[in-house]
C-alpha cells in the first residue's frame, strides 16, 4: 500500500465494487490487529490509483444446472463447518466437502489432511482440496513487509468464487459456509470506526456473496449459512450432543506456531482457550476432541478478555464476546469445574452472571432469525435447532 499506482494487465473486474467494500469494512479490524491507524489505512487505500488494461467489464456466461438436493460445504474442520456438514446431511442436501489450502498456513494442511482421511473412512466423503496460491499475496512475511492482517478478511468472498467449479462438478444448488450469529458482532475502535472482527462472515455480507455466486452461475448456485441462527456456544452444543460422530473431528486452531507442528491444537492461543472453555461449559470431555491440556489455568488469563487479557481475537473485544465468556465461565462453574480461572471468576463475576442468567441464557441459546437461508430449507433446519436446543437446556445446561 506504499505504491501510488497499480496497473493490472486485465479487464476491469465485475466484482471490483464488492471487493472494495469488503476491504474497506475490514480495515478497522486489520488496524487493531496490526496496531496501526484505521484512518491511515483508509487514506492510503482511497488515494491509491488503480488502472486496468481494459476498462470493459465482461459478464459471465453459464449454462449449467443444479440439483436442489446437492450442496458443497466449505469444510475447515472447525465447529461451524462441521455442524454445517452434519445439518446438511440430516436434511438431505447430500453435502460434498471442499477445503481451500492457504500455502502460508504452516501446519494447518497437514493436520486437516490427516483428519480428512479418517473422515472419508467413516463417512465415505472425499475432501476436495484447492490450493489458493494467490493467498501468498497477503502473506506479509512472504512479501517482506512483516506479518499483517491485511487481506485475510476477504477469505469468504474469495473462497465462494474459488469453490464455484466444485459446486458445478456436483450440480450443487447450495454453497454452504459456517457463518454463525456472532459473526455480525462489532465494536467501536479507538478512532470511532465501527469494527467488524469478521465482516466477510457477517450475514449482511453473506447476502452479497450470494449475489456474486448467483450472478456467476446464472442463478443456479446459492451461498448460504445453515448455522446463522446460532451463537457459538449453541453451535458447540448442537454439534457435540446431536452429532458426536462428526464433532470428534473438530480442529478450530490455526496451528500457526511451532506448538501446533505435531498436534491439531497448539494449546497456546486464544482459540484453543475459547474452545476449551465452551466445551467445559457444556459438560463435554475436552479429550474427546484432542484438547489435552487445561486451558483455564492462571497462566492462560491473557487469552480471556473477561480478565483483561490482551492476547485475544478482536471478537473478544466486543460486548458480545465479553458476555459469551461471562456466561461460559458461569456454566463451567455450575458444572463443577475448579480450575484457577473458574475460581477467579467466582470471586469477581459470579454475582453479575447470576443476576443476568436468564438474559444470557436467552441470548446464547435462542434461535435468531436468519436472513441468508432460503425458505425451502429454513423450516427443516430450524426444526432441528428447536428440538436440540430444548434438549440441551434441559439435559446439558445446569
Give the predicted meaning of each segment:
Residues 74-75:
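Edge beta-strand plus adjacent loop/short-helix module at the start
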Residues 80:
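Hydrophobic/small residue at the entry helix of a nucleotide-binding pocket
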Residues 1-60:
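Low-complexity, highly charged intrinsically disordered N-terminal segments
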Residues 38-71, 83-398:
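Nucleotide-activated chemistry modules centered on ATP-dependent adenylation/adenylyltransferase
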Amino acid at each position: 500500500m506504499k505504491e501510488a499506482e497499480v496497473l493490472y494487465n486485465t479487464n476491469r473486474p465485475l466484482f471490483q465494487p464488492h471487493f472494495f467494500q469488503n476491504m474497506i469494512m475490514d480495515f478497522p479490524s486489520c488496524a487493531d490487529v496490526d496496531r496501526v491507524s484505521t484512518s491511515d489505512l483508509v487514506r492510503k487505500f482511497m488515494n491509491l490509483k488503480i488502472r486496468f488494461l481494459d476498462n470493459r467489464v465482461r459478464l459471465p456466461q453459464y449454462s449449467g444446472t443444479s440439483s436442489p438436493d446437492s450442496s458443497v460445504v466449505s469444510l475447515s474442520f472447525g465447529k461451524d463447518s462441521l455442524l454445517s456438514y452434519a445439518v446438511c446431511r440430516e436434511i438431505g442436501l447430500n453435502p460434498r466437502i471442499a477445503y481451500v489450502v492457504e500455502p502460508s498456513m504452516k501446519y494447518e494442511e497437514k493436520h486437516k489432511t490427516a483428519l480428512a482421511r479418517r473422515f472419508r473412512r467413516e463417512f465415505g466423503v472425499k475432501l476436495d482440496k484447492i490450493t489458493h496460491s494467490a493467498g501468498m499475496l497477503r502473506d506479509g512475511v512472504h512479501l517482506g513487509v512483516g506479518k499483517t492482517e491485511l487481506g485475510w478478511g476477504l477469505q469468504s468472498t474469495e473462497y465462494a468464487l474459488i469453490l464455484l467449479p466444485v459446486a458445478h462438478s456436483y450440480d450443487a444448488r447450495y454453497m454452504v459456509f459456517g457463518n454463525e450469529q456472532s459473526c455480525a458482532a462489532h465494536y467501536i475502535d479507538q478512532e470511532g470506526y465501527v469494527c467488524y472482527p469478521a465482516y466477510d462472515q457477517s450475514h449482511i455480507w453473506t447476502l452479497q456473496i450470494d449475489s456474486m455466486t448467483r450472478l456467476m452461475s446464472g442463478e443456479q448456485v446459492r451461498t448460504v449459512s445453515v448455522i446463522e441462527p446460532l451463537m457459538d456456544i449453541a453451535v458447540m452444543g448442537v454439534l457435540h450432543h446431536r452429532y458426536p460422530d462428526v464433532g470428534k473431528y473438530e480442529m478450530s486452531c490455526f496451528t500457526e506456531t511451532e506448538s501446533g507442528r505435531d498436534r491439531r491444537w497448539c494449546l497456546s492461543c486464544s482459540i484453543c482457550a475459547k474452545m476449551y472453555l465452551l466445551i467445559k461449559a457444556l459438560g463435554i470431555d475436552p479429550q474427546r476432541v484432542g484438547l489435552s491440556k487445561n486451558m483455564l489455568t492462571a497462566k492462560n488469563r491473557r487469552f480471556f478478555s473477561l480478565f483483561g487479557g490482551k492476547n485475544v481475537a478482536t471478537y473478544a473485544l466486543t460486548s458480545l464476546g465479553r458476555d459469551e465468556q461471562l456466561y461460559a465461565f458461569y456454566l463451567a462453574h455450575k458444572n463443577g469445574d475448579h480450575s484457577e480461572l473458574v475460581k477467579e471468576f467466582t470471586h469477581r463475576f459470579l454475582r453479575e452472571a447470576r443476576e443476568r442468567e436468564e438474559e444470557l441464557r436467552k441470548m446464547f441459546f435462542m434461535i435468531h432469525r436468519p436472513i441468508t437461508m432460503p425458505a425451502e430449507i429454513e423450516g427443516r433446519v430450524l426444526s432441528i435447532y428447536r428440538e436440540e436446543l430444548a434438549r440441551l437446556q434441559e439435559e446439558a445446561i445446569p
